[in-house]
Amino acid sequence: MARKIGSRYTAHQILGRGSAGTVWLGEGPDGPVAIKLLREDLASDQELVSRFVQERTALLGLDHPHVVSVRDLVVDGNDLALVMDLVRGTDLRTRLDRERRLAPEAAVAVVADVADGLAAAHAAGVVHRDVKPENVLLDMQGPLGPGGSHPALLTDFGVAKLIDTPRRTRATKIIGTPDYLAPEIVEGLPPRAAVDIYALATVLYELLAGFTPFGGGHPGAVLRRHVTETVVPLPGIPDELWQLLVQCLAKAPASRLRASELSARLRELLPMLAGMAPLDVDEPDAEQPEDAPDASAASPAAPVSTAEPVRRRGAVPLVPGAKPADSNRDTHTSMRVPAPDELAGGARGTARAPRASGAPRPGSARNRAATRRRRIAVGAGAVALVAAIGVGTWLATGGDEDGGGPQDTRNSAPAAP
């Protein structure tokens, strides 16, 4: 059912739902548009509405080929909406869900486009604060780039900042998506342009590997890894690309490249990446407690199916019940800033090291079962050896038919007087 948005726009059909609201296919005076209608609880917040109006000039002035332009901001009764250019295509999360990972050339081309858009935004004083695959749109009607990549555009500018008002989120709250949060955000520092670079480098890692460098498991563990762990190398990519990733994933914001520098460096690497196949690495599973039940031990006779599709994980949702395969899931929300002792890494650390395809993961059910079998085999061998020694000793000392009395040892009882 169509609904009016202000006096100039009509929303016809829902395109998707996100954490801050619903995106509609709409119509305006100049043709089709995308209309992001914010949630009712946000629209009823007068402080947010005031901030919404204040951001109007900055958002409307952000015009770049790799940014989804905001055409208008509408405040009408209970409606609070951003009217944006309509991009005919899909988002990067949908492509990742379909392909799992991209060839390095295509991945770098997509991220270089997004870095170009971020450079324009940062020059205008706008920090995105929620860079992730869900917020990168691929224009299927645009010309193909390196590696067959479609032009990439960054969307949802201003939404994170609008939600993060002083009244709605105190200084003890984190706003964002756990897998892509820069360490300084986890530690409660104000977001600067460098947080977007860290998030974009995380996206690049995910495009190459099929998983994020610090994701997996409980959101609290994810946040701790961002602060305490170093990124583990990805096998199979050129050292120049890896060093670029490491620099942009640096814990210190000042050590990261600026968006314009990142874009230029990535485009310089494109020729050496031409023709490279997607990486062949397995996703490390989330950590399991050592006393966790072992599925293989619980039902040793159960048949193992090899036809079941591999489960893939995208961003870790903070909202209970969100389905990993749902690209519209609510991942952009708030969470308490962890205390310093909660951010301290354990003795073993929590980083998830990529493995070569088919290699067993230490701590996995399969690896634990193999370890258990080796221990049983070693134990059985030890028992057999002890038994053999015992039999040999008996034959040597007490195996004759008229053998004498038992020999006195330290552990035998003294003879009665």
Swiss-Prot record:
It holds the Pfam family Pkinase. Residues 280-293 have a biased composition (Acidic residues). SUPFAM superfamilies: Protein kinase-like (PK-like). Residues 408-417 have a biased composition (Polar residues). Its EC number is 2.7.11.1. The active site is at 130 (proton acceptor). Autophosphorylated mainly at Thr. This is Serine/threonine-protein kinase PkaB. It comes from Streptomyces coelicolor (strain ATCC BAA-471 / A3(2) / M145). The gene is pkaB.
